[in-house]
């Protein structure tokens, strides 16, 4: 059964373009580590407008391997250092669960 990991982001004013570039860069790295599909959802309603980055994995085992391998990827470590130095967004929440319709 597929599993989904989401991160909701509050994008800083004037930084949407930068955030989108960062999402595309992160997606390239994430796909190399087993992510099957990636979605970026722009919410228009709710407590505040957010962009939610969703990673879809074929199963929990693949997600576990992803979590184990990411900290050792030098490109990911470099990307995170650069993105964290001048953030384009603030993390609002994260979630992880099974896709009951897969």
Question: Which positions does each model-derived feature cover?
Answer:
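Glycine-rich beta-strand-turn "strand-cap" elements at beta-sheet edges
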Residues: 4, 8, 33-52, 77-102
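Hydrophobic pocket/interface hotspot
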Residues: 7, 19, 53, 63
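Short amphipathic alpha-helical segments
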Residues: 15-40, 70-75, 79-83
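Residue-level signal for secondary-structure boundary sites
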Residues: 17, 61-63, 102
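Glyoxalase I/VOC metalloenzyme domain signal
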Residues: 47, 56-75
